[in-house]
Amino acid sequence: MSKLFWATLSFISRLPVPSRWAQGLDFEQYSRGIVMFPLIGAILGGLSGLIFILLQPWCGIPLAALFCILALALLTGGFHLDGLADTCDGIFSARRRERMLEIMRDSRLGTHGGLALIFVLLAKILVVSELALRGTPVLAALAAACAAGRGSAALLMYRHRYAREEGLGNVFIGKVSGRQTCVTLGLAAIITTVLLPGMQGLAAIVITLAAIFILGQLLKRTLGGQTGDTLGAAIELGELIFLLALL
């Protein structure tokens, strides 16, 4: 189990993990790491929140929010943001399904992808700033949001098909069992309600899961399945929806 945790951590983040800690684990086994997504999300969000706490007394709330969201992007290497941009480039191209998937595979950033990145990043900065002004503990909010965002991605894996013939997303999409999905969603709910006691955390995770489930169905109808890019988009949008639900 520890090897699976370290392998999953190195797969979905840029935190340095010694290769020997995940040695001996086949790539095909990574799908079992879905249950680690909420915990890893909480760690990444907590580190981002720590940046906010350290910088806020020195530079104020808006700049601290800017740098903590930047830190979160760096901690993941922009992995999920890239998926968000590619997904928006493909979906909003309004082309045939096959052409949409080709556009999503293109490494160049399009207009729709650029607008999506600007909107999501700016929205996160503004929402974190507003939460801080309202007295919400930012570290707990970010840790919970990242746990919820990554946990909700399981909804785009279970009983979904991979829209392409090959790619990184194929490791998870359609390979996750119902039990693993329930454990993942349950762990995300536990983490969020522990970090944000009362109805606030519970309501936010319910809203997030409902929104991402609907997103998954819309993407399935449009693309014929899911890809690694749509998983990244779901994670980024899940984080933002959770934070918005806390307002």
UniProtKB/Swiss-Prot annotation:
Keywords: Cell inner membrane, Cell membrane, Cobalamin biosynthesis, Magnesium, Membrane, Transferase, Transmembrane, Transmembrane helix
Classification via InterPro entries: CobS
Subcellular location: Cell inner membrane
Membrane association type: Multi-pass membrane protein
Keyword match Translocase: no
Catalytic activity line of the entry: alpha-ribazole + adenosylcob(III)inamide-GDP = adenosylcob(III)alamin + GMP + H(+); alpha-ribazole 5'-phosphate + adenosylcob(III)inamide-GDP = adenosylcob(III)alamin 5'-phosphate + GMP + H(+)
One GO CC annotation: plasma membrane
Cofactor: Mg(2+)
GO molecular function ontology, one term from the record: adenosylcobinamide-GDP ribazoletransferase activity
Coiled-coil residue spans: none
HAMAP family: CobS
Main function: Joins adenosylcobinamide-GDP and alpha-ribazole to generate adenosylcobalamin (Ado-cobalamin). Also synthesizes adenosylcobalamin 5'-phosphate from adenosylcobinamide-GDP and alpha-ribazole 5'-phosphate.
Family: Belongs to the CobS family.
Annotated protein name in UniProt: Adenosylcobinamide-GDP ribazoletransferase
